[in-house]
Amino acid sequence: KEERASWNFLDYNSGAFLQTWGAYHGAEKGRSSYYYIGATAEYTYERKQHRLFAIGGYNQELTNNGDWDQWAMSSFFAKANYTYDRRYLIEGTIRRDGSSRFGNGNKFGVFPSVAAGWNIHEEAFMKPLKGKVNEFKLRASYGSLGNENIGLYKYQTLIDGTNGNETVFGNPDITWETVHMFNIGTDIRLFRNFAVTFEYYNKKTTDMIITPPISYIGGINSAPINSGTVRNKGWELDLNYGKQVTKDFGFNIHGGLSQNKNKIEELFGAPYDEGNRINQIGYALKSYYVYPTNGLLQESDFSKNEAGEWIPKEGIVIFDGQQPGDIHYIDRDGDGKITTDDREIRGSEQPNLNYFANVSLNYKKWSLDVLFQGVTGVDAYYSEPFSFGLNTSGDGSTPLKAQLDYWTPENTNARYPRLAPNSSYGNNYHTSDFWHFDASFCRVKSIQLGYTFDQLGLKKIGITNIYVYLNAQNPFTFAKEKLTDPENRGQRGSYPLVRTY
């Protein structure tokens, strides 16, 4: 058990020359408790070419975080691995976890896993290549994990303490979310200096803990449920090559590529419409849900009535008040008006490819380290201030140089719609493919140049060496779009990435 208590009780000040004084006093006490009990048992057996290791255990914990809330976990686990002649490896694990976050009959989940490996470089047929192939290992695994990361007491229906009304509906059937993952990979080292690691994985999350949208007729927040399946597939490649070429010069190059794609396979009550995002079966989580467009409306799309008002021609569908220079939205469902039903799924935030590279050079007492990082194939959409007209009133934004490329009768191929004092003009602020941009980028994350002083004079005064360096963080970014940082894609109200030197 662990208890903590603290008091803040006195603070005072006085002004000696004015013969006045003031005092503040108060008291504050906090209490938390944590109970833990655990035990493990191990067994190791080795004989000739055989090696067996096994471990089993149990642990239980109870936590109180300073109020009436309490939660507890208990776990049983066992693991064993066997190695034969340093060539063949197999390992199995099983655990049974229980959580107080779930109701009776649903507290416990069982999560097994198994893994196997083959050190091919230890085989007799690899001996002729021993000097060239230092390591060659194949490995594969399959296992499951549980997720109980939800709020407390979600399995219970709660009532208002004053009038007895039910205020929160619980779900007594809520239980563990389970992740099933298969992966296969290889580790290779050639000529002692070149290392390659490749891994492919297929991860399936079932019984997802989700909260459905609020019912239109219920009038109360929905209870969490187990419903939904999401699959993540991807691969990772890691390369490393380093060598001390001469006594004075050495280098190391480390790089990697990775790709992950997720897709919703099952979802209760789908789709979940979240405005400009949507969760729909067959698409990535939180895919963009935007209005399709066809450039900007032109004067040729309208005629004028006797009052001088712009009237759209037959086949041209607009929002009320739109005129030449505004975004031309497409009536996708053909009902003769632009509504939220015209939106469609257009991409997601998950990149097509992630990559990085780290280059280190050493020459005598000099050292240089450069780190690159980037992504390709990322969908993003501009929002305020870029899609909100000038919007210079109140806490609006300063006009941008890029907004000079706005629509006029003489500049019909402009990047921006017609000038407008705020977002209410022309309905141009809706998230649409007109505001789409490719957020691919390559960034130099850091550059560091250093020099080591280690002359004998320093050692006489007890100093082994002095390392002096110049460092720059985020000095360069290469991207197609320049209006916003392509990595965090923050626009109004977000703090930009900082360059430091």
Language model features with spans:
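Extracellular/periplasmic, surface-exposed regions of secreted and cell-surface proteins
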Residues: K1-S6, F17-V290, T431-Y501
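Conserved small-residue
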Residues: I225, G242-E349, G389, Y406-N411, ...
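Short glycine/proline-rich turn/loop motifs
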Residues: Q19-G22, D335-T340, S424-D433
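Conserved SET/PR-domain catalytic core that frames the SAM/AdoMet-binding pocket
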Residues: H254, D341, P351-K365, K445-G450
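Glycine-rich, aromatic-lined ligand/substrate-binding cores of catalytic
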Residues: R346-Y381
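Extracytoplasmic gating/loop element in the C-terminal half of outer-membrane beta-barrel translocons
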Residues: V375-Y467
